[in-house]
């Protein structure tokens, strides 16, 4: 699962080049205040109707940070009602100039930039990702995505069409309406920006359900939405669980569209709920088992580095992680040796320390899931070359893990692990590896490493994936569409294509007395 703005998953050194010394990075706030723990509905902070709360946990220590409101169906109803009222004809939001919507988004970006250190610290506390990545990558991307779509606000429009006969015809791009958005825990602020920015730029209203594992940064951003000047009801933020609050959004007959980022299994449920309710529009960005293919003529050092970061970045918790590394037979042994050495050198530890490269998994459930897959890989006959166990005595840390001798029919080769586990495969021929790479239910991303342009172009056409990288990995910007083939989802986010998901095209035809060219 996520993304945006500045190139994302380059080597740690490359990704944080502007902050190449500890002095260049600001010091994190180790114990940030938590001012917001309620639901944000109609620009007001409210308790859940049930008065229930649930804990959010620091994955570095396993200790509870605090409790937030547990929203459910009744709260979703309140939020949808507020969003519907904000979207009614003649409301301040509907009457607002498109350029003013863009100004509000730019104002929101300004406020995020003002509070960047605090937001990055909050993200690291609640999610566990290294602070230097929260600050230098995620927050950079968040700011840019709001600014990018702010620029689109008054430039997304229809066109005139030269019809036959005495008619004048034009199209309008109108907002879909009330948009339900359900975001994941691996990139909380980034995913919030991916969904909010295009929806607001095109004039929609939003009911967003944030991940129960990482609610804190999204709630703080809600306070910035109010400070920026968005009218009441335009953005509503619900904290709660997927089977209750998330399901209520997907099933709600007064929600016009739902956008979801998360697992393929839940994506199936959301698609079904949309069909069973009001046939609401659906955008899904789901799981992946993305291949990285290394040919014998590739720059070995560069390919090792890129394939390492493609998998281990964000603790392996990326929907587009390069979780199947295919290496041509003639260089396989050397590549494997270098890969293992690279994994052993990766620094795991306290994410608030500025030289940490890998923090904990997001929660106990993910921690146990990943360890379970490691045990399964060993049981199935893959060769464990490094890692494979817990790091430290508390928190949810796992040592960077590399498997060799992996076969395509093993579960670690087919299923999304979503953790720091890199399986390596050997191949002989290009046609063979293309067939194997495509032999998956997923199709989110892929990469090929080669110096041969003809081979590179062949792979870009042959691989079944929404994004194909050549000699790099995880370069995702706010200008470029992102989404998957097959069971990795439908629709696209980001770029001009990302706006299409949030508008309806209306055709207007007018009878005229006389038409002139």
From Swiss-Prot:
Transit peptide (residue range): 1-17
Localization annotation: Mitochondrion matrix
InterPro entries in UniProt: Ald_DH/histidinol_DH (IPR016161), Ald_DH_C (IPR016163), Ald_DH_CS_CYS (IPR016160), Ald_DH_CS_GLU (IPR029510), Ald_DH_N (IPR016162), Aldehyde_DH_dom (IPR015590)
Modified residues annotated as N6-succinyllysine in this record: 52, 81, 364, 383, 399, 414, 426
Modified sites of kind N6-acetyllysine: 51-52, 364, 383, 399, 414, 426, 429
Pathway: Alcohol metabolism; ethanol degradation; acetate from ethanol: step 2/2
Protein family membership: Belongs to the aldehyde dehydrogenase family.
Name this protein carries in UniProt: Aldehyde dehydrogenase X, mitochondrial
Organism whose genome encodes this protein: Homo sapiens
């Amino acid at each position: 699962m996520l993304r945006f703005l500045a190139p994302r998953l380059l080597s740690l050194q490359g990704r944080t080049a502007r902050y190449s010394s500890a002095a260049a990075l600001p010091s994190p706030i180790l114990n940030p205040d938590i001012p917001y723990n309620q639901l944000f509905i109609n620009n007001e902070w409210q308790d859940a109707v049930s008065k229930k709360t649930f804990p959010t946990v620091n994955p570095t220590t396993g200790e509870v940070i605090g409790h937030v409101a547990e929203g459910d169906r009744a709260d979703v109803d309140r939020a949808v009602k507020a969003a519907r009222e904000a979207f009614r004809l003649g409301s301040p939001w509907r009457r607002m100039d498109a350029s003013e919507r863009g100004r509000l988004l730019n104002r929101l970006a300004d406020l995020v930039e003002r509070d960047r250190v605090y937001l990055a610290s909050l993200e690291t506390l609640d999610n566990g990702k290294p602070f230097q990545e929260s600050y230098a990558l995620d927050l950079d991307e968040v700011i840019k995505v709001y600014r990018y779509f702010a620029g689109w606000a008054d430039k997304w429009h229809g066109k005139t069409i030269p019809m036959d006969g005495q008619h004048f015809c034009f199209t309008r791009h109108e907002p879909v309406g009330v948009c339900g958005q359900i975001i994941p825990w691996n990139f909380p602020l980034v995913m919030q920006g991916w969904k909010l920015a295009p929806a607001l730029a095109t004039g929609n209203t939003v009911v967003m359900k944030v991940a129960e594992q990482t609610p804190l940064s999204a709630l703080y951003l809600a306070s910035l939405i109010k400070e920026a000047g968005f009218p009441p009801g335009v953005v509503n933020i619900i904290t709660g669980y997927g089977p209750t609050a998330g399901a209520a959004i997907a099933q709600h007959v007064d929600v016009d569209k739902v956008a979801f980022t998360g697992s393929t299994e839940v994506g199936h449920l959301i698609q079904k709920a949309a069909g069973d309710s009001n046939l609401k529009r659906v955008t899904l960005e789901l799981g992946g088992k993305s291949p990285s293919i290394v040919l014998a003529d590739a720059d070995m050092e560069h390919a090792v580095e890129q394939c390492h970061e493609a998998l281990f970045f964000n603790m392996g918790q990326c929907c587009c992680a390069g979780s199947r590394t295919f290496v041509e037979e003639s260089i396989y042994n050397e590549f494997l040796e270098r890969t293992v050495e690279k994994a052993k050198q990766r620094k795991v530890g306290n994410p608030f320390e500025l030289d940490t490269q890998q923090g904990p998994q997001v929660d106990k459930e993910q921690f146990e899931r990943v360890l379970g897959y490691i045990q399964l890989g060993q049981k199935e006959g893959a060769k464990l070359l490094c890692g494979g166990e817990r790091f430290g005595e508390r928190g949810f840390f796992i040592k960077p893990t590399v498997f060799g001798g992996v076969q395509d029919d093993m579960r670690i080769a087919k299923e999304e692990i979503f953790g720091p586990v890199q399986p390596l495969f050997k191949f002989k021929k290009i046609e063979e590896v293309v067939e194997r790479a495509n032999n998956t239910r997923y199709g989110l991303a892929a990469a090929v490493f080669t110096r041969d342009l003809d081979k590179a172009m062949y792979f870009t056409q042959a691989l079944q994936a929404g994004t194909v990288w050549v000699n790099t990995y995880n370069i995702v910007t706010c200008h470029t569409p992102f989404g998957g083939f097959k069971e990795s989802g439908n629709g696209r986010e980001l770029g001009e294509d990302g706006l299409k998901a949030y508008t309806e095209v209306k055709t207007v035809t007018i009878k005229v007395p006389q038409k002139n060219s």
